[in-house]
């Protein structure tokens, strides 16, 4: 069990709400491989409705969700176009290569996580050249986690879709935190995904479920994705006990988990505003905190490890972001305004301990 009182390492650390736990205990179940589980069916129907797609598929994880989409879209030897450092490339154990047998062309992105659509078009391979792989898919991530979880607006997603479709390939949206994007932009998720041929979203991040993601797309796409899920060992039996929290999370209004994401965004901004004024904290523009991620650096990056160790001793968890370039804090269900105040006080004490700031004046 974590010793952390305030765990800001990720929104994956969330615990299910009491109502989710009750829903799990009382879930009506059946054999989902035989398509007999009514709770899973209800979740998939709700997900399809919210995303504006024909059908949906419950999967154990976001990694599996993205992978089954790649397996459907990309033939062996095909190539995927994505942004440098995108999640499927950098954080999913190279499954696009190991399982799908695909390669990936990586394009630079701007500060908001946007690839240039003209660059996407230029990245397409010449299909008549037998020396080259076949361009098979464009993938985009929304929110864009490496860029302070910036939400990408519908117009940009549609422009990427045009570039993909003009080249004769589909667009997949890795929407692990697509509901954060929708709340930040005040647009329906269906509008964000209108131009996408497939998408995934995660239930176990900001939506606070204990497990699971959902793949959405056309009915034919989901039929093929179901087969890919089976190949990966993702077909489960009485899995309504895991799908039930997802139905709670996707409810409309305050009884669900989507609307309350605005609280996480507000807490992230409070944290950023407080950190930005502290000596020793650099590379943080609070205006760029639009969802639930806060990235920052120390004026002496070599002190990153003792800083994080000091916070852990204070009961506060943050993350040395992969690549060792920044520190990350993520707000989520279970983190309240008072926790942000306590975190800021802990940061002040630790900065003083490691010599980056004067000792705080006792209250």
Regions found by a protein language model. Give the residues of each.
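Conserved PLP-enzyme active-site core in the AAT-like
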Residues: 1-298, 305-314, 319-335, 340-363
